[in-house]
């Protein structure tokens, strides 16, 4: 650490005597590459981790919304299925079938004495 400070001071003293102009971005880049490799790598890792966290949170929110939509759809289908079961039971009721047969189709009960049995060989 002390050697860096003395090196920097010697550069400043040397540059004060001469009227050279240094490009600030070049000096900063040179310092980063020479002395700041670890902090630069850590900074890049932090940025990548932050982007990954944001992306993961976004995907989690999308999947949660999709799950909620699927739960609502499942509930609607369950209600429809129950209504269809009730309708099937109501339409298949024997008294209803018998009433429709006698009223709309004019069907009658056959007396056992009037029954004809057909035997197929």
Swiss-Prot record:
Coiled coil ranges: 63-91
Chain location of the short sequence motif Leucine zipper-like per the record: 58-85
Summary of the knockout phenotype: Mutants show inhibition of cell division, formation of long, nonseptate filaments, ultimate cessation of growth and lysis.
Top-level taxon: Bacteria
Disulfide bonding pattern of the chain: none
Chief place of localization: membrane
An annotated GO cellular component: FtsQBL complex
UniProt entry keywords in alphabetical sequence: Cell cycle, Cell division, Cell inner membrane, Cell membrane, Coiled coil, Membrane, Transmembrane, Transmembrane helix
GO biological process, one term: division septum assembly
Transmembrane segments: 35-57
Topology Cytoplasmic: residue spans: 1-34
Record-linked NCBIfam families: ftsL_broad (TIGR02209), PRK10772.1 (NF008040)
Family named by the database record: Belongs to the FtsL family.
Known partners and oligomeric status: Part of a complex composed of FtsB, FtsL and FtsQ. The complex can be formed before its localization to the division site. This tripartite complex can be divided further into a subcomplex of FtsB and FtsL, which forms in the absence of FtsQ. Also interacts with FtsI, FtsN and YmgF. Homodimer in vitro. May form multimers.
Designated name of the protein: Cell division protein FtsL
Gene symbol of the encoding locus: ftsL
């Amino acid at each position: 650490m002390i050697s860096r400070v003395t090196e920097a001071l010697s550069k400043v003293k040397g540059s004060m005597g001469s009227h050279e102009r240094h490009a600030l971005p070049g000096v900063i880049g040179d310092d980063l590459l020479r002395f700041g490799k670890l902090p630069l790598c850590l900074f890049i890792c932090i940025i990548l981790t932050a982007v990954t966290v944001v992306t993961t949170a976004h995907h989690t929110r999308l999947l949660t919304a999709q799950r909620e939509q699927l739960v609502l759809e499942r509930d609607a289908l369950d209600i429809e299925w129950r209504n269809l079961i009730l309708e099937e039971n109501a339409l298949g009721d024997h008294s209803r079938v018998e009433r429709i047969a006698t009223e709309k189709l004019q069907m009658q009960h056959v007396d056992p004495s009037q029954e004809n049995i057909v035997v197929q060989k």
